Every structure is written in structure tokens, then in C-alpha cells.
């Protein structure tokens, strides 16, 4: 049997990541899983989860996406074997070498929880109730902020509420849709994602690349996680792999203020789908005609609804810009702070993949001798576990560790799973990072910014050194 396996392996071709990356479309779709290359083109129309998530994975190392997006079954491993065509000889991004029993144990116990409780991990009354209420809140606050009154200060208050409504829309409906965590219907995910373009004027397609392919697979990895930034000169230092400048000593003061422009920055940046065709180190897959149409329509609807219609209603241009900036700053602060208190805080782990290139200008990534799932725990912090308000207003991201280990499970179930996670962490001696309140979580973020900007013993680490 061993000889047969070796013979089969010799017959299979060896591919570089660059070769695999060219097969990234619906009619020619390859992926990498656990060092093996698969041509799953014939599986695309048959995939129960639809084609979009496969297209997102196309031409990439999808190992950890493949594992974390099928938490309730192991059938996908046997199914994919028939599409195996070769092995990978090089990697575009960090490779997580080790697979421990931690994640398999955690998945087994979570599966058992849903089986014994007869619950569907993607469906609950709360999911749809939240969705309806948030859409209603979004529409009502939009009307109030744009058309209900010409009183300046009242419009300012409504603009704040509209910013909050947009934040909740992003953290609940859009976020659930990008992770396929709401219903089992791919068309539902597509429609809900399109409403992000239409109502927020921001690209759902771009977000899925930044968040699902980038942040979730390479959490807190400098030069791979888009959320950390990648420029040599950055407005803040948050990893030990960055050069520190004199102004960073004040980053704990100015950085939280600048978080307010996060939403505006994202809306401007998402055009890179068509120009740079990458978000930092994360390549964009070729965009389809329908996704292009959604992108363009979303920008048009945004301009009409946020500028043209309010001007027709008789808002002055100066007042309109004021109301717009208020809602955008609220949205930016809300979202940015929600993300920062989970990953950019004290005691969490940061890593890097080096910007070293071979003769063909291909990056040579770091190999992480750790388990991907364990690193999700080491790079993430939870807070206010028992607070219903914190769970709602954060979109369940106060329980971020569970979300990273089980991104496809509806956020309503996170509180049920946390005790299981803590139990498994204790068994495997993995530290579970937790703060009792949101206040303590944000304090930890500010303290971390201060430390990184002011520590007199700070020495920049080489990007190929990962502790």
C-alpha cells in the first residue's frame, strides 16, 4: 500500500504558488489544502455553499478556510480527494505547519453541543429578529437625518444615530453574510452582501478579501493581515516588526482620534479591486460582471442617497457635509474600536512574514510551527462575556475567539460555546485572553499603543523571527 501511495505521489505534479494563482476563475479553479493542489472546477456548480466562497479561495492556500468553514463535518476531506492533481512547492503567505488536537477536540465538542441541543448553527429566531430590527433602524435614522427637519442641532443628533445604525448593520448583517453565518442559502448571503454596497457605499467584495481571506487566515501577521497595515512608514506601531518614529510616542493620543476616518478610507480604498488588484499582500480574485455591477450601483446609490437627495430636500451644502462627516466619524470610530479591542491589545501574539524575495520576485514567507486554531486564541481577546448589551452592540465580537475558530456559526450561539472553548483551552494549556468589561478592553488597547510608542527598550525585530 505504501509503494502504491509513493507511486501515485510521483505521478502528481509539483506546482509553485504562482502557478496555482493563475487558476482563479469559475471555469478554471484550483485551490491548495494541506500542501496539496486540487482542481475543483467541476465541483463549483455542485458546491452546497455556492460558488462565491470557492471563488474567494481560488488560486490560494485555502487550508484554514477549508477547515474552519466546515466545522460540523469531516466529509469535505474525503470528497476533495478525487480532485487532487499535485503538490505545492512554495507558499505565497505563511504556512501553519503543525496541527494539534486542540482544534479537533474543540470542533468535536461543539458539534456534540449542537447535536444534543437540536439547534441549527446558522439559524435562530434571534438572527432574523436582529436583521429586521437593524434594517428598520437604518431606514428610520436615514430618513430622520436627511429629510425630517431643517434644525441643525437635531440633524446632528440624527446623524450620530445614523452612524450607529450603519455600524450595527456592518457588525451584524454584513459580517454574518461574509462568513456565510446566516442561513444555509448562498443567494441570501449574496443579497445581504449587496445591501452593504447599496446602503453603505462600500464594497462587500473587497471586504470579503480583506476580512475573510486576509484577517481571518493571517490574524496579527505583519505583511499578511491587512488590518495591521503594511507600509514601512505607518501612522502607528502595533507590531514589534515596525520601525518606530518620534511621533509614535503620541500614538495613544492621536491614533484613536484618526480611527474616525476608517469608514471613509475603506470606501476610497475599495477601488483597488480594479487598480492595484490587491489589498496589501492579499490579491483580489478577478471580479465577476455581477459583482462589478453591484460595486458601481452601490457607489451611485450612495452618492444619490447621501448627497443629491438631501440637497434637493433643501439642505445647504455646508450643513450636508457636516451631517455626513458626523455620521461617518461615528461609523469609523465604532467599527475601528470594535476591531482594535479584540486584536491590538496587551499580552497578545504578533508575527510577521518577511518581505524577502527570490530571483523571480516571489516573497519567501515564514513557516509558523504552531497550530492555526491555537494562534487564533493567542492573537485574540474576549471581553464582557455575560453582557447582553456588549454582545449586541459589538455584533458578538466581544466573543471574538469563538468567532475566529467558528466563523460560520451564527453569533447568537457564541455565548453557548464560550464555556466549551474555555474548557478545551484549560485542557491544552492555551491561555484564553479575557477582560471583564469593554472599558478594560479599550484601556488595554490604549495601554498597548502607549507601550509600543514609548517603551525605551523597544528594538525592532527582524520580520523572519516569530516567537
UniProtKB/Swiss-Prot annotation:
Protein name per Swiss-Prot or TrEMBL: Acyl-lipid (8-3)-desaturase B
Keyword Lipid biosynthesis: yes
Catalyzed reactions: an (8Z,11Z,14Z)-icosatrienoyl-containing glycerolipid + 2 Fe(II)-[cytochrome b5] + O2 + 2 H(+) = (5Z,8Z,11Z,14Z)-eicosatetraenoyl-containing glycerolipid + 2 Fe(III)-[cytochrome b5] + 2 H2O; an (8Z,11Z,14Z,17Z)-eicosatetraenoyl-containing glycerolipid + 2 Fe(II)-[cytochrome b5] + O2 + 2 H(+) = a (5Z,8Z,11Z,14Z,17Z)-eicosapentaenoyl-containing glycerolipid + 2 Fe(III)-[cytochrome b5] + 2 H2O
Residues spanned by motif Histidine box-3: 400-404
A biological process from GO: lipid metabolic process
Naturally occurring in which organism (per UniProt): Dictyostelium discoideum
Reported phenotype of the disruption mutant: Mutants show no significant alteration in fatty acid composition or in phenotype.
Transmembrane residue ranges: 123-143, 152-172, 187-207, 293-313, 317-337
Amino acid at each position: 500500500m505504501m509503494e502504491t501511495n509513493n507511486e501515485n505521489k510521483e505521478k502528481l505534479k509539483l506546482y509553485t504558488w504562482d502557478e496555482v494563482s493563475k487558476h482563479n476563475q469559475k471555469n478554471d479553479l484550483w485551490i491548495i489544502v494541506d500542501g496539496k493542489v486540487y482542481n475543483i472546477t467541476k465541483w463549483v456548480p455542485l458546491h452546497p455553499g455556492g460558488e462565491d466562497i470557492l471563488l474567494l479561495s481560488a488560486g490560494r492556500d485555502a487550508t484554514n478556510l477549508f477547515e474552519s468553514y466546515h466545522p460540523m463535518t469531516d466529509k469535505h476531506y474525503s470528497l476533495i480527494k478525487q480532485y487532487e492533481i499535485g503538490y505545492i512547492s512554495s507558499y505565497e503567505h505563511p504556512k501553519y505547519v503543525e496541527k494539534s488536537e486542540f482544534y479537533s477536540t474543540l470542533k468535536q465538542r461543539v458539534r456534540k453541543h449542537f447535536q444534543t441541543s437540536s439547534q441549527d448553527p446558522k439559524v435562530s429566531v434571534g438572527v432574523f429578529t436582529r436583521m429586521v430590527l437593524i434594517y428598520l433602524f437604518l431606514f428610520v435614522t436615514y430618513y430622520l437625518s436627511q429629510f425630517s427637519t431643517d434644525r441643525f442641532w437635531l440633524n446632528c443628533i440624527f446623524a450620530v444615530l445614523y452612524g450607529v445604525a450603519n455600524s450595527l448593520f456592518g457588525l451584524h448583517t454584513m459580517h454574518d453574510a461574509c462568513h456565510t453565518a446566516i442561513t444555509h442559502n448562498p443567494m441570501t448571503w449574496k443579497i445581504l452582501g449587496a445591501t452593504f454596497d447599496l446602503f453603505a457605499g462600500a464594497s462587500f467584495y473587497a471586504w470579503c478579501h480583506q476580512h475573510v481571506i486576509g484577517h481571518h487566515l493571517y490574524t496579527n501577521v505583519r505583511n499578511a493581515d491587512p488590518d495591521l497595515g503594511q507600509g514601512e512608514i505607518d501612522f502607528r506601531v502595533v507590531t514589534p516588526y515596525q520601525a518606530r518614529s518620534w511621533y509614535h510616542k503620541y500614538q495613544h493620543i492621536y491614533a484613536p482620534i484618526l480611527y474616525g476616518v476608517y469608514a471613509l478610507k475603506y470606501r476610497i480604498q475599495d477601488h483597488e479591486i480594479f487598480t492595484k488588484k490587491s489589498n496589501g499582500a492579499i490579491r483580489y480574485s478577478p471580479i465577476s460582471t455581477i459583482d462589478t455591477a453591484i460595486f458601481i450601483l452601490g457607489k451611485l446609490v450612495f452618492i444619490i442617497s447621501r448627497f443629491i437627495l438631501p440637497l434637493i430636500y433643501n439642505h445647504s451644502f455646508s450643513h450636508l457635509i457636516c451631517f455626513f462627516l458626523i455620521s461617518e466619524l461615528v461609523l469609523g470610530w465604532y467599527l475601528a474600536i470594535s476591531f482594535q479591542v479584540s486584536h491590538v491589545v496587551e499580552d497578545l501574539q504578533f508575527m510577521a512574514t518577511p518581505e524577502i524575495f527570490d530571483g523571480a520576485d516571489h516573497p519567501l514567507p515564514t513557516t509558523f510551527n504552531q497550530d492555526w486554531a491555537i494562534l487564533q486564541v493567542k492573537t485574540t481577546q474576549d471581553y464582557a462575556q455575560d453582557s447582553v448589551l456588549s454582545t449586541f452592540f459589538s455584533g458578538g465580537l466581544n466573543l471574538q475567539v469563538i468567532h475566529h475558530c467558528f466563523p460560520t456559526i451564527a453569533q447568537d450561539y457564541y455565548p453557548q460555546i464560550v464555556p466549551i472553548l474555555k474548557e478545551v483551552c484549560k485542557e491544552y494549556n492555551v491561555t484564553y485572553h479575557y477582560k471583564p468589561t469593554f472599558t478594560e478592553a479599550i484601556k488595554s488597547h490604549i495601554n498597548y499603543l502607549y507601550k509600543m510608542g514609548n517603551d525605551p527598550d523597544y528594538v525592532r525585530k527582524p520580520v523572519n523571527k516569530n516567537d
